[in-house]
Amino acid sequence: MAKGKFERTKPHVNVGTIGHVDHGKTTLTAAITTILSKKFGGEAKAYDQIDAAPEEKARGITINTAHVEYETATRHYAHVDCPGHADYVKNMITGAAQMDGAILVCSAADGPMPQTREHILLARQVGVPYIIVFLNKCDMVDDEELLELVEMEVRELLSKYDFPGDDIPIVKGSALKALEGDQSDIGEPAIFRLADALDSYIPTPERAIDKPFLLPIEDVFSISGRGTVVTGRVERGIVKVGEEIEIVGIKPTVKTTCTGVEMFRKLLDQGQAGDNVGVLLRGTKREDVERGQVLCKPGSITPHTHFTGEIYVLSKEEGGRHTPFFNNYRPQFYFRTTDVTGSISLPEGTEMVMPGDNVSITVKLIAPIAMEEGLRFAIREGGRTVGAGVVAKIIE
């Protein structure tokens, strides 16, 4: 049977479930696909189909992730759910599944637990912009006051990590009851309330093509009589012939003009997000540009050396280090297309970092990189990946 054609008529939004183990993330995911597919079409997925999440690799790290999709009246959602806590940590840090918003699942019977807290912190660190709460297992709590107490706790926890705890939509329900077709307030109607909250609270993400132009430079050539050409894949935005652009990173920032865009040996008047192009630069010498720099819209991104980040350190089984590392560890940081050496400072009270851990760190690079919060990187030793990370805050 052929899969239904993917209709691009509705805007596309990426979401995922986060929260403590056994609070009902996978059951909720199954309930959403089951109930929304009845009303808007799409494919219902059973719990065990989602729970048997396939392995995938992101930046050399193996992650188990289940991908489902569903529709609401106004949108198409791609939704990720992970079976284990470690998978969430890896997923969020590597950005394997970028989330425009997250659904925090919290059991009303248990209240916030350690991983509830950790996932909120991770969401903050890796730049998940919006969180919606599904207060699950409400059928197990008879006391209305207890429900209110748990809701208050969750709101306080969100505020503590700089999310707008007072304004975040909290939907009360029971994913299991909804899956069973229960029509009471906490059954199927709760899933529709959640869908409405997703539609109204998470803004439609800006498309890559509408963002300011950025192209990570992969190669540089000199073409006699024409000048210098840099090649790479346009990450976002559009570059038009005749536009002023900047070369940022590694060396001092310089301005130049795009005098030509080439794709598959054909001349174009512009290159856009997703295109693999060659960009001809006016008056730029071959030796003034190198792999690891970026071409960008002037002023849209700046070079930095000093930042805080959240990293996941590969375990020995994943091909990572066999031993811990300590303060002032100096690996290479692989940003976009190149390695830059940097030193790591660990948080106070953290003596060392073991393979398989995740930790907040401060990094000082020996050369500046075009950087913004949310940028992903790999940590490498002699060309082999030993960790993955994301820029949380730029210091300078």
From Swiss-Prot:
Keyword hit for Ribosomal protein: no
A GO molecular-function annotation: GTP binding
Compartment list: Cytoplasm
Recorded catalytic activity of this chain's protein: GTP + H2O = GDP + phosphate + H(+)
One Pfam family here: GTP_EFTU
Keywords assigned by UniProt, alphabetized: Cytoplasm, Elongation factor, GTP-binding, Hydrolase, Magnesium, Metal-binding, Nucleotide-binding, Protein biosynthesis
Region G4, annotated ranges: 136-139
GO cellular component terms listed in the entry, alphabetical order: cytosol
EC number: 3.6.5.3
Annotated InterPro entries: EF-Tu_GTP-bd, EF-Tu_GTPase, EFTu-like_2, EFTU_2, G_TR_CS, P-loop_NTPase, Small_GTP-bd, T_Tr_GTP-bd_dom
Domain of life: Bacteria
Binding site for GTP: 19-26, 81-85, 136-139
Region (G3): 81-84
Residue span, tr-type G domain: 10-206
Region (G5): 174-176
Residues that bind Mg(2+): 26
Region feature (G1): 19-26
Region annotation (G2) ranges: 60-64
Family: Belongs to the TRAFAC class translation factor GTPase superfamily. Classic translation factor GTPase family. EF-Tu/EF-1A subfamily.
Record's subunit section: Monomer.
PANTHER family from the UniProt entry: ELONGATION FACTOR TU, MITOCHONDRIAL, ELONGATION FACTOR TU-RELATED
NCBIfam families reported for this sequence: EF-Tu (TIGR00485), PRK00049.1 (NF000766), PRK12735.1 (NF009372), PRK12736.1 (NF009373), small_GTP (TIGR00231)
HAMAP family registered for this protein in UniProt: EF_Tu_B
Task of the protein: GTP hydrolase that promotes the GTP-dependent binding of aminoacyl-tRNA to the A-site of ribosomes during protein biosynthesis.
Designated name of the protein: Elongation factor Tu
Source organism: Azoarcus sp. (strain BH72)
